[in-house]
Amino acid sequence: MDVHDVKLTISAVAAAQYPEDGHPEIAFLGRSNVGKSSLINKLIQRKAMARTSGVPGKTQTLNFYDLDSRLFFVDVPGYGYAKVSKTARAKFAAMIETYLTTRQPLRGVVLLVDSRHEPTADDISMYQYLKYYQLRTLVVATKIDKTPKSKRLHVAKQIKQRLDLNQTDDVILFSATTGEGYEAVWSWLEQTAGLEGR
């Protein structure tokens, strides 16, 4: 999909603030600093549309990015950051749960994991949560350019085993630096959002 116009439509903290356009939505989930904003920026070919930060836990709202009035990317607050207060973590969790379990236009979820490390207990819990609610999920292993090519198949296999990936879900190795995995991720997004050939 060639993206021409991108705008941050809404930064929401409650369901009443969600867009009412009815366009399909894809949510991006992952631990703090896993590379969500970098992935989104690469996919939409913008250097700084989604705000990247060296500070974990920076995203504290559901950020809805409108792509050509056809599709929303939803940047979800990162999980697993210990320095965020328990109160803030509980607030984030409730906000994310409400969105994932009640949002009609949501077509699928991109779950990001760091390819340099095994999926964490938080990653495993999140994947199990997504499967419990039968949400279509793509696992994207970020920062794959940091891993030697000879070890990448092993990385993908390790992620599949650790998450106990079901047969309908897949792992795509991705690098925001080199663009590896870009076309494969977009292919999944278009198919999942029902935008193939449109």
UniProtKB/Swiss-Prot annotation:
SUPFAM superfamilies: P-loop containing nucleoside triphosphate hydrolases. GTP binds at residues 30-37, 57-61, 75-78, 142-145, 174-176. GO terms for molecular function: GTP binding; metal ion binding. Its cofactor is Mg(2+). Keywords: Cell cycle, Cell division, GTP-binding, Magnesium, Metal-binding, Nucleotide-binding, Septation. Belongs to the TRAFAC class TrmE-Era-EngA-EngB-Septin-like GTPase superfamily. EngB GTPase family. NCBIfam families: GTPase_YsxC, small_GTP. This is Probable GTP-binding protein EngB. It comes from Lacticaseibacillus paracasei (strain ATCC 334 / BCRC 17002 / CCUG 31169 / CIP 107868 / KCTC 3260 / NRRL B-441) (Lactobacillus paracasei).
